[in-house]
Amino acid sequence: MNALILCVGQLKERYFTDACHEYLKRLTRYGSFELREVPDLKIADRSGTPGEDGLTAQEREVIRREGEALLKQIRKDDFVVALAIDGKQLSSQELSDMCLKWRMNGRRTVLVIGGSLGLSPQVMARADYKLSFSKMTFPHQLMRVILLEQVYRAMTILSGEKYHK
């Protein structure tokens, strides 16, 4: 499998970076896996009235600009999977089946994790598939670890290894 995990923001906590590096190291036996970060943008002015979407104009601008940075990393022929609360929830076995399809389609799979404000409408429109791990909201830093662990679990299922229970 050829995959890019594309994220907004840089991990600062060592326990998250250590976990991500461990799963990326484990995944190397199953293909090419890369973790790439784009900068998260700070909101200069937290004042402002939220619109119908619950976001202020400044927050919408941050989401738009982060989305542009993400889209610059995505190639035209990539298969894009956006992590989104309203995406499809899968079991580990079903994710394994999806990973097999993604591996067989011959395209690079790009798994996109948004920042604290989520993904822009433009990134969501570019997504070929929307994946959800829960209806709950997780910190985007933790979501990287969860995603990498689940992809690793999916790869072990495909390989018939004992990791998956």
What residue ranges belong to the model's regions?
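N-terminal beta1-alpha1 ligand-phosphate binding loop
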Residues: 1-27
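Structured adenosyl-cofactor binding patch, chiefly the S-adenosyl-L-methionine
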Residues: 117, 121-165
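Short glycine-rich anion-binding loops that position phosphate/pyrophosphate groups of nucleotides
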Residues: 11, 85-88, 115-118
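S-adenosyl-L-methionine/SAH cofactor-binding core of RNA-modifying enzymes
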Residues: 33, 39-107
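Short hydrophobic segments within beta-strands
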Residues: 6-8, 36-38, 112
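Conserved beta-strand segments of alpha/beta enzyme cores
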Residues: 32-34, 129
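Short, surface-exposed alpha-helical segments at coil->helix boundaries
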Residues: 17, 21, 67, 121-124
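Loop/turn-to-beta-strand initiation segments
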Residues: 2, 107-112
